[in-house]
């Protein structure tokens, strides 16, 4: 059959296929390196370079088998024997519908499934062309089932692996020995799965036809050699690196403790009475007496009683005014009487009282000290700023947030917060005492006008309920330095593995219809008996990489950071288990969604780490998008198919 008159559709198909590959790279690239970028083991530029290499390699070696499912497994191509041009127009329509919806989703930073798009688009044009009889519904049912199986299976595998790692490595007092013992196993498992995938799926491309047992034996042998190499060279090097890092951090910690001890010995803990501090009866209220007394006193406090320090109380503002700084470096809140009858003051950092305060808090801590109060002490010592020690004296809660991206401003923002009050002074000059006093004054006035009870964060909860230590929550969200080193390169390796699997699976979403279009044009029929050309797979890989570099960062933010915090240890389990699921599915020719596998793994591991770590609202939106994608892509494809069938083909 002469097909030259339809050459225009082939040319149009190549253009649209590249746009479709671009959209796949812009949206689905977050499945490969999103978690690696989110955990900080690679930068965005490094992720793009690595992904470009492994996406292209995976598309060439693994993409052929899944491409066959996309081309011939969803619709019955034999029904188009007499209307070849209709099938060609349908393939073009499928690519247009899928590309348009994925570009829209990428613009909206919404991670969707490229597999969903192409399947929905294929069904859409078939319904317009020959109705429901053109769809192989049983194959569609299997594909739909895989959409649910893939996140559940990937999530289960990731969760199981993470639980084992947490029990045997992360929760140990010294995680290094077990971590080093497990490194060869982790590397061997990663390499074995990767080699098996290449040998099994890519063997025909490489000109190798081997039985299953031979492929398994080769994969196992390569994995053993790699494990031996890791045990012989990588583990000793990693042990030396971790030991050196821990020794360096230990030395810095000792220097910090010695500095504090010298400060405490240099000043005797004698607190002076502050002028300008008045109680309701106009009598002067001293900040404190001897070292054993509290920071605030009242008439109701009997001699010899020692209430806890002010930073451990729930305090409320009733009335008062703010005075300007006093010459001796103090700052008085004249008449600020709290609900407990105490009067509290702000002192200057250079007045000498700050050192006494440090000593007071240090000796006031007992073995029964609550975790939240312990956290306040660490916060005070770490920040050494006006905000922190004022919080300790005046009962104002402090939430310190540091922007790692701005190394020049490690104390970029500190907030004074109440139940409904939030005051933030960006880039506050802590060496300027007056600017700090203004910040405190504004927070106090805001609390006065709103009638808000100002409380310490440690006292906001019910005192009868067990308190959660913010420091412990932060520790739970981050890996220890030695654990970070153990899993750093391992997550990079698994991310490359995931990118390889992504290229093998998702290149078919972009190139499957183009391959069908090309083979129909070359053979003059719909049978498509020839193998998938390698150069077409490479063409799709180039398009995916282009989309990654231009627009990939938009969805990386959603997958790598917004859904749940990622650490190297959790990222490793997410990458390995989800990539394993995708590779297995690719090898059996089942078009699973890499988005579903990765989302399932991220949510499962995040939920196991902490019930509060997962953004369930975002997960709900993603879950809804899974169902919306198929009909929306189908509608776009059906509209284009109707235009081609009834508006263009009859006149060509």
UniProtKB/Swiss-Prot annotation:
Gene induction: Increased by phosphate depletion in osteosarcoma cell lines.
Outcome of substituting residue 595 to M: In IBGC1; substantially impaired phosphate transport
Quaternary assembly: Homodimer.
Phenotypic consequence of residue 91 to Q: Abolishes phosphate but not sodium uptake
Protein name as catalogued: Sodium-dependent phosphate transporter 2
Keyword ATP-binding: no
Organism: Homo sapiens
Upper lineage: Eukaryota, Metazoa, Chordata, Craniata, Vertebrata
Topological domains annotated Cytoplasmic: 27-46, 108-109, 164-190, 235-482, 552-571, 610-621
Consequence when changing residue 601 to L: In IBGC1; substantially impaired phosphate transport
Disease annotated for this entry: Basal ganglia calcification, idiopathic, 1: A form of basal ganglia calcification, an autosomal dominant condition characterized by symmetric calcification in the basal ganglia and other brain regions. Affected individuals can either be asymptomatic or show a wide spectrum of neuropsychiatric symptoms, including parkinsonism, dystonia, tremor, ataxia, dementia, psychosis, seizures, and chronic headache. Serum levels of calcium, phosphate, alkaline phosphatase and parathyroid hormone are normal.
Task of the protein: Sodium-phosphate symporter which preferentially transports the monovalent form of phosphate with a stoichiometry of two sodium ions per phosphate ion. Plays a critical role in the determination of bone quality and strength by providing phosphate for bone mineralization. Required to maintain normal cerebrospinal fluid phosphate levels. Mediates phosphate-induced calcification of vascular smooth muscle cells (VCMCs) and can functionally compensate for loss of SLC20A1 in VCMCs.
Record InterPro entries: Phos_transporter
């Amino acid at each position: 059959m002469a097909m030259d008159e339809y050459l225009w559709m082939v040319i149009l198909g190549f253009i649209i296929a590249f746009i479709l590959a671009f959209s796949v790279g812009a949206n689905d690239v977050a499945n490969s390196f999103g978690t690696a970028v989110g955990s900080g083991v690679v930068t965005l530029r490094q992720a793009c370079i690595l992904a470009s290499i492994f996406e292209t390699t995976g598309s060439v070696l693994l993409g052929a088998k899944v491409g066959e499912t996309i081309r011939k497994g969803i619709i019955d191509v034999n029904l188009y024997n007499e209307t070849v041009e209709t099938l060609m127009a349908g393939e073009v329509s499928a690519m247009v519908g899928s590309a348009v919806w994925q570009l829209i989703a990428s613009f909206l930073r919404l991670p969707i499934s490229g597999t969903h798009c192409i399947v929905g688009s294929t069904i859409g044009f078939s319904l317009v062309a020959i109705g429901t009889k053109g769809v192989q519904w049983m194959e569609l049912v299997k594909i739909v089932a895989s959409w649910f199986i893939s996140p559940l299976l990937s999530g289960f595998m990731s969760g199981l692996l993470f639980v084992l790692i947490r029990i045997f490595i992360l929760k140990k007092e010294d995680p290094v020995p077990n971590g080093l013992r497990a490194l060869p196993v982790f590397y061997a498992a990663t390499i074995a799965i990767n080699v098996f995938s290449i040998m099994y799926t890519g063997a025909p491309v490489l000109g190798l036809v081997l039985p299953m047992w031979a492929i398994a034996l080769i994969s196992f042998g390569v994995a053993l050699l790699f494990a031996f190499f890791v045990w012989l060279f990588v583990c000793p090097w990693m042990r030396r690196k971790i030991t050196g890092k821990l020794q360096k951090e230990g030395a810095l910690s000792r220097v910090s403790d010695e500095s504090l001890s010298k400060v405490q010995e240099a000043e005797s803990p004698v607190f002076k009475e502050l002028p300008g501090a008045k109680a309701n009866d106009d009598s002067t209220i001293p900040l404190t007496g001897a070292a054993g007394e509290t920071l605030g006193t009242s008439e109701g406090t009997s001699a010899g009683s020692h209430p806890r320090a002010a930073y451990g109380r729930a305090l409320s503002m009733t009335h008062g005014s703010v005075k300007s700084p006093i010459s001796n470096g103090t700052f008085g809140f004249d008449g600020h009487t709290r609900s407990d009858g105490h009067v509290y003051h702000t002192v200057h950092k250079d007045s000498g009282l700050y050192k006494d305060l440090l000593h007071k808090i240090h000796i006031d801590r007992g073995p029964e000290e609550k975790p939240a109060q312990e956290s306040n002490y660490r916060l005070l010592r770490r920040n050494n700023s006006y905000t922190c020690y004022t919080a300790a004296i005046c009962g104002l809660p402090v939430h310190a947030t540091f922007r790692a991206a701005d190394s020049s401003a490690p104390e970029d923002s500190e907030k004074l917060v109440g139940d409904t009050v939030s005051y933030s002074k960006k880039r506050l000059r802590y060496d300027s005492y007056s600017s700090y006093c203004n910040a405190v004054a504004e927070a106090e006035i805001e609390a006065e006008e709103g009638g808000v009870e100002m409380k310490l964060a440690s006292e906001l909860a019910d005192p009868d309920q067990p308190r959660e230590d913010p420091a412990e929550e932060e520790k739970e969200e981050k890996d220890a330095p030695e654990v970070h080193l153990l899993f750093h390169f391992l997550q990079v390796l698994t991310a490359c593995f995931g990118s390889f699997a992504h290229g093998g699976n998702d290149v078919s979403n972009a190139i499957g219809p183009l391959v069908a279009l090309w083979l129909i044009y070359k053979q003059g029929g719909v049978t498509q008996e020839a193998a998938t050309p390698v150069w077409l797979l490479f063409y799709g890989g180039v398009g995916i990489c282009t989309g990654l570099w231009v627009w990939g960062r938009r969805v990386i933010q959603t997958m790598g950071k917004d859904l749940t915090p990622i650490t190297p240890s959790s990222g490793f389990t997410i990458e390995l288990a989800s990539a394993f699921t995708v590779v297995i599915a690719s090898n059996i020719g089942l078009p699973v969604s890499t988005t579903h596998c990765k989302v399932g793994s991220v949510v499962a591991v995040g939920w196991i780490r902490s019930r509060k770590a997962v953004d369930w609202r975002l997960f709900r939106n993603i879950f809804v998008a899974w169902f919306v994608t198929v009909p929306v892509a189908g509608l776009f494809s059906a509209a284009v198919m109707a235009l081609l069938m009834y508006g263009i083909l009859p006149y060509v």
